[in-house]
């Protein structure tokens, strides 16, 4: 057996954001999963927030990209470089680093063996002594303080940037789960497409995300908020300002929300009766950034006829759970697909 020290890390390697948990300190890194590169030399210009601020604003020889897509690695070398940057950030105050850290890194529950191997290899290349995968919904459940090690059913719905993870958990394992590549990014795309088709206006990812956060809702609100947005008129090519309503955005998000709700319902249908009874008592717990979409908890509750709760600190649950799982790292040793 190997000891777990204060230098070991839990990493929530997300499509939208990367969080790093250090044992004894909590979350010490919280940055967008974005890297800015020189197109000719492939050298790194910026990582994280600095790189995200460059999206849509870079000169021709610099490109800001997200090396993760739908919860898996889309650009291996860039992901490894980004992870190395964040690992170094997390341990920069450790003085002379006695040894490389063990790293617990989250992966989507629907990932393939090849995709999981890429995450493990990238984590090792980034400076880990060794890397151990933990399924995202399991980490989210730990971070949400659900009784995952007990013989009782817990249900978590983790809505991240690239994937939505739905899982029933009992006795330290996932009983049944579903991973769909529909989540926060898909919501942003739906808003972009709606604005383009309805107003002939092109907006960027950052504007779409701001719209979602400010006036987005899983169902049409009784009193609709308005929001002024700017983009490029596709007819004239010139900048243009329009005003949109919350009801419009809830309509734009309808299909995405419906897909997430169907994933929740289909997972419940595969749940053993005893565990379903536990979930009816305890409720379905929502985690991830998507849990913050207004009225999503209400819509899921109405569709499933079950209580639905939003976890405390939903954005941090996966990272916290990944960090807490370091205490049980021996259970994950050699546990790959």
From Swiss-Prot:
Family annotation (InterPro entries): ATPase_NBD, MreB, MreB_MamK-like
Keywords: ATP-binding, Cell shape, Cytoplasm, Nucleotide-binding
Domain of life: Bacteria
One cellular component term from this protein's GO annotations in UniProt: cytoplasm
Activity control note: Polymerizes in the presence of millimolar divalent cations in a protein concentration-dependent manner. Polymerization is favored by decreasing pH and inhibited by monovalent salts and low temperatures.
GO BP annotations, alphabetical order: cell morphogenesis; regulation of cell shape
Recorded GO MF terms: ATP binding
SUPFAM superfamilies: Actin-like ATPase domain
UniProt main location, coarse: cytoplasm
Nucleotide-binding found in the keyword field: yes
Subcellular location: Cytoplasm
Residue positions binding ATP: 15-17, 161-163, 209-212, 289-292
Effect of gene knockout: Disruption of the gene results in loss of cell width control. Depletion leads to a strong defect in chromosome segregation. It also leads to the formation of enlarged cells, to the loss of mid cell localization of the replication machinery and to growth arrest. Double dynA-mreB deletions have strong cell shape defects.
Cited function: Forms membrane-associated dynamic filaments that are essential for cell shape determination. Acts by regulating cell wall synthesis and cell elongation, and thus cell shape. A feedback loop between cell geometry and MreB localization may maintain elongated cell shape by targeting cell wall growth to regions of negative cell wall curvature. Filaments rotate around the cell circumference in concert with the cell wall synthesis enzymes. The process is driven by the cell wall synthesis machinery and does not depend on MreB polymerization.
Family, as annotated: Belongs to the FtsA/MreB family.
Subunit and interaction comment: Forms polymers. Forms a complex with Mbl and MreBH.
NCBIfam families, A to Z: mreB, PRK13927.1
Misc note: B.subtilis has three MreB paralogs: MreB, Mbl and MreBH. All paralogs have the ability to support rod-shaped cell growth normal conditions. The multiplicity of paralogs becomes important under stress conditions. They are probably used to allow cells to maintain proper growth and morphogenesis under changing conditions.
Full protein name: Cell shape-determining protein MreB
Gene that this polypeptide is encoded by: mreB
